[in-house]
Amino acid sequence: MIRLGLYSLLASIALVLFAQCTSGKSSGSETDPSGDSAQVAAGVVDGKLVFPPKPSMMVSDFAGVLTDSIRGLEDDLRRYASEVPIEIMVVSMAHIGDGDVWQLAHEMGKRWHLAEKERAVLILIVPKSPDGSAQAAIFASQGIRHIFSETYCRGVVSNVMQPLLNDKNYYGAAAATVEDVLKTLSNVQL
């Protein structure tokens, strides 16, 4: 518990520093070069959602809930990317304020240029929403959206992820979702 709290504190400090460096002020806002004023988050800073640039890692644990498992999950995702090929990213965010987790996943996919890729999936985990429950969403790129429709993704969140998230097994939820995505892809001709 202490370790998780320390990682959450460090992640919050890093987000504040990131927001100050990228915006030049302490408001935590970020200007989108496309002119789109929608904001999504890696956390809430000064009451505003902060969205980081696309990380180089396939696992971004902004919430500090995957800390012991990141290396193994990162290695697995890189191996899958070379074998399948598909880019799967797992992102955890400490909180998203009143934001909609599905809209955030979609916006993150667009901003990180996953949307136009042939095969990319983003798995977003928010361990604590305003109502206290964990939330998750799955975003699929345009090239595989016919396989991973919104209905399919919502079903995976409800049936695969949510039971594990309710038990605070965030790594298990991410790993089970990755497994489900790969199993589904293996049953479909791309």
Regions from the PLM with identified roles:
Residues 2-6, 16-120, 127-190:
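A structural boundary signal for the start of the first folded domain, especially the loop/turn
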